[in-house]
């Protein structure tokens, strides 16, 4: 009989092992056997919890997108009366949270984006994440700008966030957070009306 609470512990172990494997060998070269070995479990455990490698990869990406959502929401909840500028900076901060810019997370996101073009479930996850970012940004810009300008500013800031993140991911170096925050802050202040 399985121990109570083991499922969440095992799932966490396997997701962490998947991130480690992707970080070291890439998504395509990460095998079920390697992941199981890293997690200290049998390959049958992966099949039991996730069906197959694709199920495990999907769960890993759901976990990373959930961490992104939480990083943004935690910052926004801390600013219930914050200005549009403060709340936009909170969204930026959530996207540059350590859970999103660690080497393992960045490599997993890159692999996820590439795979999402060919796997419908990953594509849906990618679309939800992308739409959530844009919706959050537009909503905050909308507090100060007409709809069309808010949509353009939101799209521009989303592109800047993604671009800064992508440049860091492809450089193999850590994200320069002070520079990223400076550039995004400048973009935000350029697009919000001055008092």
From Swiss-Prot:
Keywords: DNA-binding, Repressor, Transcription, Transcription regulation
Pathway: Amine and polyamine biosynthesis; betaine biosynthesis via choline pathway [regulation]
GO biological process: glycine betaine biosynthetic process from choline; negative regulation of DNA-templated transcription
Segments of the chain annotated as binding DNA: 31-50
Example of a GO MF term: transcription cis-regulatory region binding
Recorded coiled-coil stretches: none
Residue ranges annotated for the HTH tetR-type domain, each copy included: 8-68
HAMAP family for the chain: HTH_type_BetI
Summary of the function given for this chain in its UniProt record: Repressor involved in the biosynthesis of the osmoprotectant glycine betaine. It represses transcription of the choline transporter BetT and the genes of BetAB involved in the synthesis of glycine betaine.
Protein's recorded name: HTH-type transcriptional regulator BetI
Record organism: Escherichia coli (strain SE11)
Lineage of producing organism: Bacteria, Pseudomonadati, Pseudomonadota, Gammaproteobacteria, Enterobacterales
